[in-house]
Amino acid sequence: MSHHRSTALTPSSAASKIPVEESRTAESDSDEDWVEDDAASLEEHPMPTGWRHRATWLYLLHLLASLAAIIASFILSADALYSARHPDVLLDCDLNAKVSCSTVAQSWQAEIIKLGNLSFPNAYFGIAAESVFITIAVLGLSRVIFPRWFALCAWLGNLAALLYAYWLLSQSLFVINALCPWCILLMFSTTIQFMALSHATVTVQGLPSHPRKLATYYRLGADLLVDVVWIVAIVAVILAVDGSAIFS
């Protein structure tokens, strides 16, 4: 004689399953709503198209700027070593009292990171940072779509490099009272690098999730005007402060 065991849902077990099913349904609905909202956002504010907004152009520009920046960093590192060994010898980029790499290299601003009695030229960290940016550019040229956290960290890292370059420029203009040509090259390279990476972060990597205003900004080409004004403003400030001394 066989015994058949029947399983019946008690009111308590059935009630316990209802919230789980409702939770899963709510999560599914929220995901669908997010996708629908994102699709509606793209339809209302489509992402810009064309070669200027694609990965090939943007990451190529980013790569070229990063290469220029790392070359400048290597030269600055070599100059720092040479100055340490030959403190009384002028560098090749010491053109006059105003355009003087030696004056900038011997300032405390050129070595802001210190560990005890040891100090390291900022150019060493520039080499490390630019190596990372070159890697990002190569991956971007390979059509890699980064995780959102990585794309955000890359942009924030480039922003930090840009802010440091502008801080050093302000110190050179108003505190050190001397300009380093390789530092100027590094500053302009970092600026172009940041412009390209910001553009790629929006149009290629899709960050932020709802870039309505940014999509319109790039689609209308407003970034071109802003970038040109940006570069011209930097040149104007340098010439206004030290123009006469630079060409003396």
Identify the function of each model-found stretch.
Residues 27-56, 204-222:
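Membrane-interfacial, low-structure loops and terminal tails that flank and connect transmembrane helices
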Residues 104-132, 179-191:
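Membrane-interface loop-to-helix entry segments
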Residues 120-145, 160, 164:
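Hydrophobic alpha-helical transmembrane segments
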Residues 236-248:
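Juxtamembrane boundary at the C-terminal end of a transmembrane helix
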